[in-house]
C-alpha cells in the first residue's frame, strides 16, 4: 500500500477559493475589534476609577480569561452551522462591544448603580464572544482549506497584525480624536459589517431558507442602525453622562492623548476636572496658588528665572507674573491641548489674567523628566504643580531620581516648592513626598493651607543647595489670602496631622502611589 504524501494527511476535502482569502482578511478586522474593546474597557476604568495599573491589569486578566471560556464553548457549535453562528456572533460582539463605553459612562453617573459589577460583566460577555471568533473562523477555513498548517499560520498572522494596528491607532488617533464612546460604536459597526459581508458572500453555503436569511439580514440591519445612531449621538451621550456626573454645565470637554479635560460652570464658579478628578474651583483656587507660589518668591527676593512644571492652567503663572523682577518663566506641561485651552478660551484666559500672553513666558509641551534631562537652563525658583500621584506614570515625577534631576537646574540659593496632596486626608502620601525630597538631598519646610474645594492641602518648600527659608511676614504683591498671621499658621501642624513612618518614593517601589491609593480609599469608602 503506497504512503500518501505528508500534505495529504493535513488536508480537508474542500478546495481553496476566494472566500478563504476574504475570511482571513476578516480575521484582521475581528482581531482589531476584539483588542479595541479591551483597550476601551481598560481606559474607561482608569478614567473613572483611577489607578491605571490595577484597572488595566484586572480588565486584561478578566478579558483573557473570558476569551478562554469562549474558545472552549466554540467546540459545541455544529460544523454545519458555523457560518450562521458566526454571523450571529459578530452581531452580538458588535452590539455589546459597540455600546459598552456609552453604557458605562451613563451608568457611572448614577451614584447607586453597581458600576464595577456591570463593568466586569460586560468585559466577561464581550470576552466570551470574542474568544469564540477565531476558533469558528479556523474551523470554517479548515473545511475549505487544503493545508491546516498553512491555515494556522495565516490566521494567527492576521490576528496579530490586527492587534498591532489597533494598539497603535487607539492611543494616537482613535481615543484622542474620536473619544472612547464614538470609538466603541465605530468598532461595533466593523463587527456588524463583517456579519453582513458573511451573510451576503456565503448566502449559498448557509444552508438556510430565504425566510431565515431574511430574518438574519433584518437583525443585522437593526444592530447596524442602532450603532450608527449611537455613533452620530456620541458627543451628546458623553455630554449627558458628564453633565450627570459633574452636576454643572459643561463649557469645555476635550480628549487628548494623555487625559480627558472637562471644564464646568455654575454661576461664577468654573471648575477643571482631569480624568474626572477636580483640579480647581475658581471660587477658591487663589488660596491654593498663593500658597503654592508666593512664600518661595518672597524668600528668593532676587528671583529672575522661574520654572513651572505642570500648571498648564496658567494659574500659578498668574501669581509669578505679579513680581516685576521676574524676567523669564519656563512652563513645562505635557499636554498641548491643556495649555492651548487656557491660552484661548475666553473665561479661562480671564481667570489666569492672560498669563500665557505675557512675553516673559515660554511654554514647552514635553514630559518634564525628559525635558530636565536635556535642558541646560538654571532657575532661581522651581514650582512643581503636578496632578496627584494616582498612578505610576505620575508617581515617577515624585521620585528620588526626579528630584535629584530637578536639583541640577536650581541655583545654589534657589528654592523648590511642590504640591504634595493633603496632610490631613492622605498623611502617608504627604509625608512620603517630604521623605523623598530629603532622600534626594533637599532640606524641607512642610506647610499646608485650607482650600475649601479640596480641604486641608499640603505643600513642601525645599532647598537643594544652601538657601535658607523663613516664612515671610509681608508680601510685596497684592494677596487675597496670605498675610503674616496666615503664613505663620501654614507652617504649624495641629496634633491631628501627625507625621507617620513612611519610606521614600523610589522608582523600583513607587511607594507613594500605594500610599495615595490606600489613604484616599480610606477616606472615600
UniProtKB/Swiss-Prot annotation:
User: Positions of the region Spermidine synthase?
Assistant: 222-471
Any Gene Ontology biological process: spermidine biosynthetic process
GO CC terms, sorted = plasma membrane
Q: Which SUPFAM superfamilies match?
A: S-adenosyl-L-methionine-dependent methyltransferases
| Membrane-spanning intervals of the chain | 21-41, 53-73, 89-109, 117-137, 155-175, 180-200
Positions annotated to bind spermidine: 289, 313
Q: What is its main location?
A: membrane
- Indicate the enzyme's highest-level EC class: transferase
* Pfam families the record matches: Spermine_synth
UniProt keywords, alphabetically = Cell membrane, Membrane, Plasmid, Polyamine biosynthesis, Spermidine biosynthesis, Transferase, Transmembrane, Transmembrane helix
Quick one: which residues bind S-methyl-5'-thioadenosine? 259, 333, 367-368
Residue span(s) of domain PABS: 220-464
Q: Single GO molecular-function term?
A: spermidine synthase activity
The subcellular localization recorded is: Cell membrane
The pathway to which it is assigned is: Amine and polyamine biosynthesis; spermidine biosynthesis; spermidine from putrescine: step 1/1
State the reactions this protein catalyses.
S-adenosyl 3-(methylsulfanyl)propylamine + putrescine = S-methyl-5'-thioadenosine + spermidine + H(+)
Write the Enzyme Commission number(s) for this entry: 2.5.1.16
Kindly give the membrane topology term recorded for this protein: Multi-pass membrane protein
Which residues carry out catalysis?
385
PANTHER family given for it? THERMOSPERMINE SYNTHASE ACAULIS5 (PTHR43317:SF1)
The subunit field of the Swiss-Prot or TrEMBL record says: Homodimer or homotetramer.
Give the record's family classification: Belongs to the spermidine/spermine synthase family.
Function summary: Catalyzes the irreversible transfer of a propylamine group from the amino donor S-adenosylmethioninamine (decarboxy-AdoMet) to putrescine (1,4-diaminobutane) to yield spermidine.
For this entry, the protein name equals Polyamine aminopropyltransferase 1
**What gene is behind this protein?**
speE1
Amino acid at each position: 500500500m503506497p504512503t500518501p504524501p505528508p500534505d495529504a494527511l493535513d488536508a480537508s476535502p474542500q478546495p481553496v477559493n476566494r472566500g478563504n482569502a476574504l475570511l482571513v482578511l476578516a480575521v484582521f478586522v475581528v482581531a482589531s475589534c476584539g483588542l479595541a474593546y479591551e483597550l476601551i474597557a481598560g481606559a474607561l476604568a482608569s478614567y473613572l476609577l483611577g489607578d491605571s495599573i490595577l484597572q488595566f491589569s484586572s480588565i486584561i486578566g478578566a478579558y483573557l480569561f473570558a476569551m478562554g471560556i469562549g474558545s472552549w464553548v466554540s467546540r459545541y457549535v455544529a460544523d454545519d452551522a458555523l457560518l450562521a453562528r458566526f454571523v450571529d456572533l459578530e452581531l452580538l460582539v458588535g452590539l455589546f462591544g459597540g455600546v459598552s463605553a456609552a453604557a458605562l459612562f451613563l451608568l457611572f453617573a448614577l451614584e447607586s448603580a453597581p458600576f464595577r459589577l456591570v463593568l466586569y460583566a460586560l468585559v466577561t460577555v464581550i470576552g466570551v464572544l470574542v474568544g469564540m471568533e477565531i476558533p469558528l473562523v479556523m474551523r470554517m477555513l479548515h473545511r475549505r482549506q487544503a493545508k491546516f498548517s498553512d491555515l494556522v499560520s495565516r490566521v494567527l498572522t492576521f490576528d496579530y497584525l490586527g492587534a498591532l494596528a489597533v494598539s497603535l491607532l487607539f492611543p494616537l488617533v482613535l481615543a484622542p480624536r474620536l473619544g472612547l464612546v464614538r470609538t466603541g460604536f465605530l468598532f461595533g459597526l466593523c463587527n456588524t459589517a463583517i456579519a453582513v459581508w458573511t451573510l451576503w458572500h456565503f448566502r449559498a453555503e448557509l444552508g438556510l431558507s430565504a425566510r431565515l436569511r431574511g430574518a438574519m439580514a433584518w437583525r443585522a440591519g437593526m444592530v447596524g442602525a442602532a450603532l450608527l445612531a449611537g455613533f452620530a449621538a456620541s458627543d451628546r451621550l458623553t455630554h449627558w453622562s458628564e453633565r450627570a456626573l459633574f452636576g454643572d454645565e459643561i463649557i469645555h470637554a476635550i480628549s487628548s492623548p494623555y487625559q480627558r479635560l472637562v471644564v464646568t460652570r455654575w454661576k461664577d464658579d468654573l471648575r477643571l476636572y482631569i480624568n474626572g478628578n477636580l483640579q480647581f474651583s475658581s471660587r477658591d483656587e487663589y488660596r491654593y496658588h498663593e500658597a503654592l507660589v508666593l512664600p518661595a518668591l518672597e524668600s528668593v527676593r532676587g528671583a529672575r528665572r522661574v520654572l513651572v512644571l505642570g500648571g498648564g492652567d496658567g494659574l500659578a503663572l498668574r501669581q509669578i507674573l505679579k513680581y516685576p523682577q521676574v524676567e523669564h518663566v519656563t512652563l513645562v506641561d505635557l499636554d498641548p491641548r491643556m495649555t492651548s485651552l487656557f491660552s484661548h478660551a475666553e473665561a479661562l484666559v480671564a481667570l489666569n489674567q492672560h498669563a500665557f500672553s505675557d512675553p516673559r513666558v515660554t511654554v514647552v509641551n514635553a514630559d518634564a523628566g525628559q525635558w530636565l534631562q536635556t535642558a541646560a537652563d538654571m532657575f532661581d525658583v522651581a514650582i512643581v504643580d503636578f496632578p496627584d500621584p494616582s498612578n505610576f506614570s505620575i508617581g515617577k515625577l515624585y521620585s528620588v531620581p526626579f528630584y535629584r534631576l530637578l536639583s541640577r537646574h536650581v541655583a545654589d540659593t534657589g528654592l523648590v516648592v511642590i504640591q504634595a496632596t493633603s496632610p490631613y486626608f492622605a498623611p502617608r502620601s504627604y509625608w512620603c513626598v517630604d521623605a523623598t525630597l530629603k532622600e534626594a538631598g533637599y532640606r524641607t519646610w512642610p506647610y499646608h493651607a485650607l482650600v475649601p474645594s479640596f480641604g486641608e492641602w499640603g505643600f513642601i518648600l525645599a532647598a537643594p543647595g544652601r538657601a535658607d527659608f523663613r516664612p515671610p511676614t509681608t508680601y510685596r504683591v497684592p494677596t487675597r489670602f496670605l498675610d503674616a498671621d496666615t503664613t505663620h499658621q501654614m507652617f504649624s501642624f495641629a496634633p491631628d496631622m501627625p507625621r507617620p513612618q513612611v519610606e521614600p518614593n523610589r522608582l523600583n517601589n513607587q511607594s507613594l502611589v500605594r500610599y495615595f491609593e490606600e489613604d484616599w480609599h480610606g477616606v472615600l469608602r
